Amino acid sequence: MHRTSIVEELERHQQDQKADQEPGSVSDASNSALQESSDPRLSTTDNTNTPEINVNDQQQEQQVASGEDTDPPSPRMKTIVKPPPIKVVPPLNFGPVERNLYRSGQPEPISFPFLEKLRLRTILWLAVEDPSDNFLAFADDHEIVVHHLGLVTEGTNPWDQLTESSIVAALQIIMDRDSYPLLVCCGMGRHRTGTIVGCLRRLQGWNLASVSEEYRRYAGSRGGRALIELHIEAFDTSRIIVYPESAPEWCSS
C-alpha cells in the first residue's frame, strides 16, 4: 500500500508538469492577458469617439479670458468708387507767364471749371476770328472783360502777324494791375500769344536767346516762325508807358 501511493503520487506530478508545458493553458492565457494590458499597441479599446483637444484654441481662449492682447485682424483695402466732382483740365498750351498772368489757346467748355479757379478779371483775345459762343457766355457769367485785339482792319491780311498797335494795346493792359488776374489767348496759344509774351519779355529786359527759346517751346514740334521772332526783336519797347503806381506787383519786384 505504501509503494502504491508513492507511485501514484509520482504519476500525478508528471501529469501536472505536462499540463504546464501544453499551449493554451491557463497560465499562458493569463500571461498573454497581462502582456496585452501592458502594451498599448495590443489594446482593443475603441477610441474613435474620444474628442480631440486643440491646444492652440485653449491658449487663445485663455488669452481672451485673461484680457491679454491678441493679434489684430488684417486691415482691408478701401476702394474709392466715387470720382472727383470736378475735372481739372487746363486749356491747350496753358502756362503761367508771371504772377496772376497766364497764356493759353482758346478755352473749351471742359476747361471752364479750371478757369473758375483762376478768378480771371480780363482776357486778351488775339485771334482774327471771334471767340466761341460758349467762351463768351462763360466770360459774361463770370464778369470777365474780353478785349478782342486780333480784329482785321481794311486792307490787312488775316494771316499776317499782329500789328504794332495791337501789341502796344495788349501790353498797356498787361501793365495795369487792375486787369489782373489776366489771360492772354488765341486760337492755339502759339504764335499770336507768343508774340505778346515775347514783346513783354523784351520789356522786362530778357535777352533774345531766352525770348526765342520760350516762343519755340510753345510753338510746338513744327517750330516757330522766323518772321515772328524778327518782329519781337524789332519791337520798340519805348512805346509802352509803365506807371509805377498802377504796375503789377511782379513788375516792381
From Swiss-Prot:
Where would I find the Tyrosine-protein phosphatase domain in this sequence?
93-249
The active site of this protein is located at 186 (phosphocysteine intermediate)
Composition bias type Polar residues, residue spans: 27-65
The GO biological-process annotations, alphabetized, read as: cellular response to oxidative stress
Q: What's the source species' lineage?
A: Eukaryota, Fungi, Dikarya, Ascomycota, Saccharomycotina
* Domain of life assignment: Eukaryota
Primary role:
Putative tyrosine-protein phosphatase required for protection against superoxide stress.
UniProt biased composition (Basic and acidic residues) = 1-21
Q: What is this enzyme's EC?
A: 3.1.3.48
Keyword Zinc on entry: no
Subcellular localization is given as: Cytoplasm
Give an example GO cellular component term for this record.
cytoplasm
Keywords associated with the record: Cytoplasm, Hydrolase, Protein phosphatase, Stress response
Q: What is this protein called?
A: Putative tyrosine-protein phosphatase OCA1
Spans annotated as Disordered: 1-84
PANTHER family according to UniProt:
TYROSINE-PROTEIN PHOSPHATASE (PTHR31126), TYROSINE-PROTEIN PHOSPHATASE OCA1-RELATED (PTHR31126:SF8)
Q: Which Pfam families match?
A: Y_phosphatase2
**Catalyzed reactions:** O-phospho-L-tyrosyl-[protein] + H2O = L-tyrosyl-[protein] + phosphate
